[in-house]
Amino acid sequence: MTNVNTSEALHVNRTFKSTLFIMLFEDKKNLLELYNAITGKHYADPELLEINTLENAIYMSMKNDVSFLIDGRLSLYEHQSTKNPNLPLRFLLYISHLYSRLTVKENLYGETIVQIPAPEFLIFYNGKDKMPERQILRLSDMYSVQEGQPKLELEATLLNISGSNNQKLKEACRTLGEYAIYTDKIRNYTETMELSEAVDRAMDECIREDVLREFLMKHRAEARAMSIFEYDQERHMQQEREAGIEKGRRIGLAEGEEQLLRRQVQKNLSRGMSISEIAEVLDETEERIREIASEDPGEQAE
């Protein structure tokens, strides 16, 4: 038997709390609307949904996923704004964890078959990189040895919702369509103005145009802080990927995460976010954010 350090294997980076996508689709009504649009079903009772979203488990980045049970299916929906060919492996780790939780009281050593819900993996992409309208990502593409029929396969469907892509789907699910409009506005405006200004303009326009109006009016402060963080993080992740890999290996994951947190705090402070807003978005205490904010920014560039 192989010994596995579960605390190490399931190490979670809790720097990030959530995304706007999660905020919208953790609402059962919105999630059911999206499910119906994708499957062509016509369910009307949101209480049919049993949401099973893990608290950042397994993921080493944002909690971008929404998983739920309905009609004997376990559907995992994730939002992405950057290209990520590793999603099939992440989905495999995630579905394994969910199946483990769903069957915790079952006898997996017995003679009776234990039934499990059929999985579905969907990625909603709205990044700036050019991507096909629909793409299948396969776990087998990640194998170091490519030969014959893979013994273990997982397929995830990527749906591009940027611009005019998948227009019928966005028309069938108004919430998804309006989410795409809002994020497209931010992305377009960041080409000519500061990020915080771009977010404010996008929010004001969407409220006037009845795009996510009720949601943005009710959650404006949190949605604003989250939007600024998400789009800044998108650029930040690319920079970290290019410049920080070797350094992260040398100093270790824990120290690397600490430095990342410090840079995020200073960046968000420079964006005009308050201590409480940063603490909320980064899932840290206000005391910890104040401690970092009081430090000399120059010390964090070392």
List each language-model region with its residue ranges.
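Elongated, amphipathic alpha-helical interaction scaffolds
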Residues: 1-302
